[in-house]
């Protein structure tokens, strides 16, 4: 009797852990500046900047499309502007907004990668930015 009770507890624990692991797993990849820089040279990659327009104007990665992640219609704008057959390389200021955006887009079928550290890491690595 005690053995069965213990086994039930173990099974419930394992199922809980497996369920949490699945719920918390990312459906996109976080990559470092060097790998991001190599990736964005591929013609099958679209660069997405999810910062605000004023941040974008201060400096952005060449070729980046701007869609503010804080806009209520972010997902709708992304669907209209981003091809589903290409990898979406996403960045923001520090990597937090872009991770959020990557999760949203990956949930609707996009293949996404997120720049760890965002444009701050990009600039720190002395990578080029364009200003408007």
Task: Please place each PLM-identified region on the residue numbering.
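Rhodanese-like catalytic fold shared by cysteine-dependent sulfurtransferases
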Residues: 2-10, 24-39, 45, 54-87, ...
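Sec-dependent N-terminal signal peptides
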Residues: 10-19
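Intrinsically disordered, low-complexity boundary segments flanking structured domains
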Residues: 17, 52-54
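Structural scaffold elements adjacent to functional motifs in cytosolic proteins
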Residues: 47-49
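Short, surface-exposed ligand- or partner-binding patches at beta-edge/loop junctions that are enriched
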Residues: 91
């Amino acid at each position: 009797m005690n053995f069965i009770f213990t086994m039930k507890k173990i099974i419930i624990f394992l199922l809980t852990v497996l369920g949490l692991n699945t719920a918390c797993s990312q459906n996109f990849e976080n990559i470092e500046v060097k790998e991001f820089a190599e990736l964005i040279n591929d013609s099958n990659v679209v660069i997405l900047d999810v910062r605000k327009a004023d941040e974008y104007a201060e400096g952005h990665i060449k070729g980046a499309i701007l869609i503010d992640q804080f806009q209520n219609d972010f997902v709708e704008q992304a669907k209209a502007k981003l091809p589903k057959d290409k990898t979406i390389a996403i960045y923001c200021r520090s990597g937090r907004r872009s991770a959020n955006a990557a999760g949203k887009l990956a949930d609707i079928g996009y293949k996404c990668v997120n720049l760890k550290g965002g444009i701050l890491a990009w600039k720190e690595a002395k990578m080029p930015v364009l200003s408007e």
